[in-house]
């Protein structure tokens, strides 16, 4: 019930979408702060020119930072398990996941360019208070889980490179230095940061490319696996692995990150042509970055498909025991079960098969993947916290707290885990948690980019909206199957387990449906006059569109001249 007190504005609970004067002031301060940060200038030349390498270079950066999420240790582990279990048969799934990811990243970049705000900032103004707080918490959980994977990957890489001399918990402590590295590089501007990420991607390309060249997998089978959308002779194990590949590639927090990174370019939003140009070049740059990340992932799949497909633990163990320069040569159990592999065992196998150099180069690649991913995770945490809760802390505080939240549970895990193989097994659980969080990025990005009030004449076309909705529904359905299988296979399906999970599942589904309702209204599939108890669609929020004001002024001037 609305308050009758006239001394102040209506409380947000009464009209949760209402933007008060204080909200406008906060937004103005945020925009002023953003403008004061270093932005990359875009060359001013003929905007009608179809293509310019100079302009592409100016826009290059955000897409490569975004592509790091496709190369994190969780993805690498999913790749090698895919190769060991299904050979080259799931490469088409990997390719499809990258294509879908490209389309989603395109939406994210367009949102940042057109609205001048990133996803968290738009969500803050678009959703009522309680839903946006829940949304923020869900994305923070996704960021923490992702960061845990990167910290674990980096610690394992250090453990592998030192031949076990550096304990895992020390490796985790070493990753804290990422925080200070990030702060140091960030002081010198976004271009320097992008250069460092470019170097790390190059390191991964060389490392995993080296393994590909040494192993020499059959190119014909690799190409066939990419273009033939089928998995002959596959069962439930291969199907679950395919789901894992999709879940590892499409990361929820990455959509929030990309929409913020594109704001590092100085785009004149008063000129429609400049906005369209930015959308074009960011899409092209993202496509190039994800094309490269796909081939890096392909290298990993092919290496382990060629070496470990249809091999048993005993086969690999026998090969490793014969070598004396490889640590943990007896890590593979002496049984005839299909070989089980993770990022640590993968390095041991490469050392056993091709020598210590191959093992060290693999470790360097995993280290680069972990380092780059922890830094992008920190960046994402900063943007999400700023956008959702408007915390005006010094940057070093925000970064330290974001890292501490991720490192603390990882430290506990390393202290109590019995061996490195148990630690790497956490990746499956962390991937599962991130799949649970995926709707809280997928649904909002479709909602925002389909909204006339946010994107105006740059909103997604009806065909693209329908494609995005169908694709997202398919991904979410597959995720539900994977999550339910994962949970019940580990916890069991006894009545008391179901009783505990039922209320949590009900609340989760209810919130997803709430977000989906907003999405359908934005897509104009259902009218904004919909009346459902407890649901009020935001009719008053409208993002600025300075190019429309300029267009209107030009039309008015021309009419006056005539």
From Swiss-Prot:
Glycosylation sites: 334, 422
Transmembrane segments: 56-76, 84-104, 141-161, 165-185, 195-215, 242-262, 288-308, 348-368, 399-419, 429-449, 463-483, 497-517
Domain of life of the native organism: Eukaryota
Compartment(s): Apical cell membrane; Cytoplasmic vesicle membrane
Name by which UniProt lists this protein: NRAMP-like transporter smf-1
Function summary: Probable divalent metal ion transporter which regulates Mn(2+) uptake.
Similarity field: Belongs to the NRAMP family.
Major subcellular location class: membrane
Disulfide bridge map: none
UniProt source species: Caenorhabditis elegans
């Amino acid at each position: 019930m609305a308050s009758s007190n006239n001394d102040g504005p209506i409380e947000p609970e009464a009209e949760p979408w209402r933007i008060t004067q204080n909200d406008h002031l906060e937004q103005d301060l945020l925009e002023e702060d953003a403008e004061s940060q270093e932005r990359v200038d875009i060359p001013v030349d003929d905007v009608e020119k179809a293509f310019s390498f100079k302009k592409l270079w100016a826009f290059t950066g955000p897409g490569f930072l975004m592509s790091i999420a496709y190369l994190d240790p969780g993805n690498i582990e999913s790749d090698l398990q895919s190769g060991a279990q299904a050979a080259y048969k799931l490469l088409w799934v990997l390719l499809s996941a990258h294509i879908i990811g490209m389309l989603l990243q395109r939406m994210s970049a367009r949102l940042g360019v057109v609205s001048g705000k990133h996803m968290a900032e738009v969500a803050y103004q678009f959703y009522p208070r309680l839903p946006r707080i829940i949304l923020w918490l869900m994305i923070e959980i996704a960021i923490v889980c992702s960061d845990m994977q990167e910290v674990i990957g980096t610690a394992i890489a250090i453990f592998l490179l030192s031949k076990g001399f550096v304990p895992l918990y020390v490796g985790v402590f070493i990753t804290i230095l990422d925080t200070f590295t990030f702060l140091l590089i960030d002081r010198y501007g976004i271009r320097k940061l992008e250069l460092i990420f470019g170097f790390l991607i190059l390191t991964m390309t060389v490392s995993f490319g080296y393994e590909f060249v040494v192993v020499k997998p059959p190119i014909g089978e690799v190409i066939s696996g990419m273009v033939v959308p089928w998995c002959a002779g596959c069962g439930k194990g291969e199907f679950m692995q395919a789901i894992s590949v999709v879940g590892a590639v499409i990361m929820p927090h990455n959509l929030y990150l990309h929409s913020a990174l594109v704001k590092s370019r100085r785009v004149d939003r008063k000129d429609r042509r400049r906005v369209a140009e930015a959308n074009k070049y960011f899409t092209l740059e993202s496509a190039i970055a994800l094309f490269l990340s796909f081939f890096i992932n392909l290298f990993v799949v092919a290496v382990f498909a060629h070496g470990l497909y249809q091999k048993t633990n005993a086969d690999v163990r026998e090969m490793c025991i014969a070598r004396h320069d490889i640590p943990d040569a007896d890590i593979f159990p002496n049984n005839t079960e299909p070989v089980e592999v993770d990022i640590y065992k993968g390095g041991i196998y490469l050392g056993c098969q091709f020598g210590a150099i191959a093992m060290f180069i693999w470790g360097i690649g995993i280290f680069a993947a972990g380092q780059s991913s922890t830094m992008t995770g920190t960046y994402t945490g900063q943007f999400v916290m700023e956008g959702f809760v408007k915390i005006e802390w010094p940057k070093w505080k925000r970064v330290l707290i974001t890292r501490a939240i991720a490192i603390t549970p990882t430290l506990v895990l390393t202290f109590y885990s019995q061996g490195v193989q148990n630690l790497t097994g956490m990746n499956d659980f962390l991937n599962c948690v991130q799949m649970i969080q995926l709707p809280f990025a997928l649904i909002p990005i479709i909602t925002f980019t389909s909204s006339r009030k946010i994107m105006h004449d740059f909103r997604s076309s009806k065909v693209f909206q329908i494609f995005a909705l169908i694709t997202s529904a398919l991904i979410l359905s597959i995720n539900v199957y994977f999550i339910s299988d994962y949970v019940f296979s580990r916890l069991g399906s006894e009545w008391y387990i179901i009783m505990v999970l039922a209320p949590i599942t009900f609340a989760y589904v209810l919130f997803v449906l709430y977000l989906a309702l907003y999405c359908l209204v934005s897509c104009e599939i259902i009218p904004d006059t919909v009346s459902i108890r407890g649901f009020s669609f935001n009719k008053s929020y409208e993002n600025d569109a300075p190019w429309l004001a300029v267009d209107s002024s030009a039309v008015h001037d021309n009419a006056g001249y005539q």
